[in-house]
């Protein structure tokens, strides 16, 4: 929202950097910030790691990163908590010196590379034997000129297990794009498996307290509706 306010944009541009976290930032927002002269640094971390410990994909000194089988991110090192006072099962601290997160990611060049956070494991969509993460699909949809905001989620499907569904907010003055147009747009950069099979146009996306899209609310809203 600050990028739509000239005074706020100018104030942010005077800072050394603006730290963002909580999930992957949409490319249009990053591009708009860069065009306004705002230095944006993407942070990654959680309470168990004493907050942010990876900045623009690069871990702080003393922080270790691994990507486990299945793609989950594991974090170790000096900033890591010893564990939970009341451990849960399975315990993400079970491996000594490491915390197994619920996030999926990739390291560019082995365990010493730059980390890319792909999304949450519990948000992955299993469709036709393939796994689709919402965030890369949202990033692709967000580059369509008619899409101002979007969210991707999975709905139960008798044939596929789950189908990929998109909810979009249309940009001011733009005609709503068709499902076919958005599928073709996504397929330019991702496998066609990731392209949405169902489209909903909404006025606003539901969000939780800290601003994250509430995918569960979208699932509840659109479950059982026919394809559009």
Locations of the language-model features?
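Short beta-strand-to-turn element immediately C-terminal to the catalytic PLP-Schiff-base lysine
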Residues: 2, 53-57, 68, 76, ...
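Gly/Ser/Thr-rich phosphate-binding loop
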Residues: 3-59, 64-66
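Hydrophobic/anchoring residues in structured secondary elements
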Residues: 20, 152, 200-201
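Conserved ATP/PPi-binding loop(s) of AMP-dependent carboxylate-activating enzymes
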Residues: 59, 68-96, 112, 127-132
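AMP-binding/adenylate-forming catalytic core of the ANL superfamily
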Residues: 77, 104-194, 204, 217
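Flexible lysine-rich "adenylation lid" loop at the C-terminal edge of ANL adenylation domains
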Residues: 196, 202-222
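A short, polar/charged loop-to-alpha-helix boundary motif
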Residues: 222-228
């Amino acid at each position: 929202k600050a990028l739509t306010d000239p005074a706020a944009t100018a104030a942010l541009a005077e800072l050394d950097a603006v730290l963002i976290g909580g999930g992957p930032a949409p490319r249009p927002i990053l591009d708009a910030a860069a065009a306004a002269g705002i230095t944006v640094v993407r942070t990654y971390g959680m309470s168990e790691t004493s907050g942010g410990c990876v900045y623009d994909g690069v871990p702080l000194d003393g922080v270790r990163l691994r990507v486990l089988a299945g793609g989950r991110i594991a974090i170790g090192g000096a900033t890591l908590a010893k564990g939970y006072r009341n451990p849960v099962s399975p315990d993400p601290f079970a491996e000594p010196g490491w915390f197994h997160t619920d996030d999926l990611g990739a390291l560019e060049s082995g365990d010493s590379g730059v980390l890319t956070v792909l999304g949450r494991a519990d948000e992955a969509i299993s469709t036709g034997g393939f796994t689709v993460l919402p965030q890369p699909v949202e990033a692709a949809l967000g580059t369509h000129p008619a899409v101002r905001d979007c969210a991707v989620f999975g709905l139960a499907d008798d044939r596929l297990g789950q189908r990929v569904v998109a909810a979009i907010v249309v940009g001011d003055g733009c005609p709503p794009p068709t499902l076919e147009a958005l599928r073709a747009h996504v397929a330019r950069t991702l496998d066609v498996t990731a392209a949405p099979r169902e489209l909903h146009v909404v006025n606003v996306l539901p969000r939780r307290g800290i601003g994250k899209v509430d995918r569960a609310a979208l699932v509840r809203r659109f479950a059982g509706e026919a394809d559009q």
